[in-house]
A protein has these predicted regions:
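Short, well-ordered coil/turn segments that N-cap beta-strands
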Residues: 1-4, 38-40, 74-80
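Active-site mouth loops of central-metabolism enzymes
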Residues: 9-29, 78-84
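Amphipathic, alpha-helical segments enriched in basic
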Residues: 2-9, 17, 44
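Glycine-rich, proline-tolerant flexible connector loops at the mouths of alpha/beta enzymes
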Residues: 40-68
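Active-site cofactor/substrate anionic-group-binding motifs, chiefly glycine-
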Residues: 62-84
Length: 84
């Protein structure tokens, strides 16, 4: 039997509503709650090298910028990804 995986894209797809400006505290809270909920794959935003880094937004130029936001947070067994 195939295993079903749950992917959450709130921090990426939700950005179409607020121009990816969730605020740093909200980004961390959403991330931590989704990890606690046990999602298998968590999309943390868009990578767009035309954008400058802003820790309040989930659209960022590089994976190093994503690591500045999420790198020290507990990821459990969740795979962390971003859309290009």
């Amino acid at each position: 039997m195939k295993q079903v995986k749950l992917l959450d894209c709130t921090l990426r797809d939700g950005g179409y509503v607020n121009d990816w400006e969730f605020g740093h505290d909200n980004i961390v809270t959403i991330f931590e709650r989704l990890i606690s909920a046990g999602v298998d794959i968590l999309e943390v935003g868009f990578l767009d090298d035309r954008r400058s880094f802003d820790r309040n937004r989930t659209i960022m130029p590089t994976t190093q910028c994503a690591d500045q936001i999420f790198g020290k947070l507990d990821k459990g067994n969740t795979m962390i990804v971003a859309m290009i």
